[in-house]
Amino acid sequence: MNEFEIDNEIEITDETELTYDLIAQLKKKYKKIWKTTLVDGTEIVWRRLNRKEYKQIMKDYEDIENRGERLMEREDAVCRAAVLFPRGEALEEIIEYMAGASSVISDDIYEKSGFRVAAPEEL
């Protein structure tokens, strides 16, 4: 059984179900969390990336020469860093078997992490 401790009080395993109690615990820890529902109904709960995490992800994959491959690896890494539920093998299966899932989820994560803050306003 893969276990990923988000903190000492919140433990997510492959058997963990998304409940109101779990959502409340995650909100208490991260303040703001979001949910993306994939086309098959799978619910993905995630948080924002912070600047340090973003910079590390960019650095970790900068040596991949192929731009498309580099982008896909970064999208997967963003999901692994920010997705709170599901975790472990369940998340890896989503990334592996739903080709566009990490792209969709990472786009949502980027948006709420400040990469599309607001539309410019003419003065």
Label each PLM-derived region with a short phrase.
Residues M1-K27:
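Short, basic/low-complexity N-terminal boundary segments at the transition from targeting/disordered tails
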Residues N2-F4, Y30, V39-L123:
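Short, surface-exposed, charged amphipathic helix/loop patches that serve as local interaction elements
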Residues L26-W34:
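A short, compositionally biased
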